[in-house]
Amino acid sequence: TVKTNKRTISADEFFKGLFTTALQDGEIITAVSFPVAAKAGYAKFPHPASRFALTGVFVAKTAGGDVRVTATGASQNGVMRVPGIEAALKANWSAGAIDGVKVPADGLLNDIHGSSGYRANLIKVMAQRAVAAV
């Protein structure tokens, strides 16, 4: 949750795209809050030269059982949630639970570093690695 000098915005509503947020003129972020994760992990597949994430995935599970999975470096819109993997991990927090999940390639980057299909697969693999590391 993002708190500003004027309002409170959920993270899903705050991030509008790559380098774009829901902030209005004169609005300043005053606080950011999020539930403490009981389990969390991050794995990235770095670009060999820059070391930036070609695809990076963060997985988190709260004590109450809520699960969030986000990917960076793969989407045309910046950070994205991965609902299919979230649902699989909510049912069974294990790397194997992700095996049957198909991550859609729609909206993913397609460039000289990797096709959108390749990035969709990387999201899945990095999510499995992040869960396995917890």
Roles of regions detected by a PLM:
Residues 1-134:
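C-terminal structural segment of proteins
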